[in-house]
Design a protein with these regions (language model features):
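Conserved N-terminal beta1-alpha1 strand-loop-helix module at the mouth
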Residues: 1-41, 51
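Short, well-ordered coil/turn segments that N-cap beta-strands
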Residues: 3-7, 35-38, 65-69, 94-96, ...
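Active-site mouth loops of central-metabolism enzymes
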Residues: 7-25, 69-81, 133-154
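Alpha-helix-loop-beta-strand connector modules within alpha/beta enzyme cores
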Residues: 48-72, 115-137
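Glycine-rich, proline-tolerant flexible connector loops at the mouths of alpha/beta enzymes
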Residues: 35-57, 103-113
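Conserved anion-binding
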Residues: 97-155
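A generic, well-ordered mixed alpha/beta core segment in the N-terminal half of proteins
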Residues: 73, 83-106
Length: 155
C-alpha cells in the first residue's frame, strides 16, 4: 500500500486595486513557506479589470514566488474577445491553468450571451488555447439554477 502525502493549497481573492495588495503580498510570502501544491486566484464578476487583478496576482505568485497557480475565469459577464485577451495575457506570464466557471449572476446586471454555461467557456478555451489545462467545478447536489439533474450534467 502506498502512503500518500496530503497536499495543501490556497485560494486568494485579489484586493480592490484602489486599496492595494501589500497585506496580501506579505501573506503570500508566509504561505510560500508552507510549500502549497498550488494557489488559485479568483476573479470578480464584472467588478474589476481581470488583467489588473487576477492576471497580475497570478503572475506574481507563479513567477515571483514560484508557486504553481490556477486563475479563475468566470464567464457570464465576459465576451469571447475579453476571454481571448485574458488567455493571451495569462499565456504571456506563463499561467496555463484555468478554473473555468460560469460565475455568479449579479442582481441588476444583465449577463452577456457568449458563455451561458462553464461548458461553453471550456469549449472556447480548448479551441482558442488548447495548451491550457482547464479545470471545472460543480455542485454535488446540482446547480441551484438548473431545472433538472440531467440538464445540470449536460451543462
Amino acid at each position: 500500500m502506498t502512503k500518500q502525502t496530503p497536499s495543501l493549497s490556497f485560494e486568494v481573492f485579489p484586493p480592490n486595486p484602489e486599496v492595494g495588495n501589500a497585506k496580501l503580498l506579505r501573506a503570500l510570502e508566509n504561505m510560500q513557506e508552507l510549500a502549497p501544491h498550488f494557489i488559485s486566484v479568483t476573479a470578480s464578476n464584472n467588478k474589476y479589470n481581470i488583467k489588473e487583478t487576477t492576471v497580475a496576482l497570478a503572475n506574481h505568485i507563479q513567477n515571483e514566488l514560484s508557486i504553481p497557480t490556477i486563475a479563475h475565469l468566470p464567464a457570464i459577464y465576459l465576451s469571447k474577445e475579453k476571454v481571448a485577451d485574458t488567455l493571451h495575457e495569462l499565456d504571456q506570464v506563463g499561467v496555463h491553468r484555468i478554473l473555468a466557471l460560469r460565475g455568479d449572476i449579479i442582481p441588476g446586471i444583465e449577463p452577456l450571451k457568449d458563455f451561458r454555461y462553464a461548458t461553453d467557456l471550456i469549449e472556447f478555451i480548448k479551441t482558442e488555447a488548447p495548451h491550457f489545462d482547464v479545470i471545472g467545478a460543480c455542485y454535488p447536489e446540482g446547480h441551484p439554477d438548473s431545472p433538472s439533474q440531467i440538464s445540470d450534467i449536460q451543462n
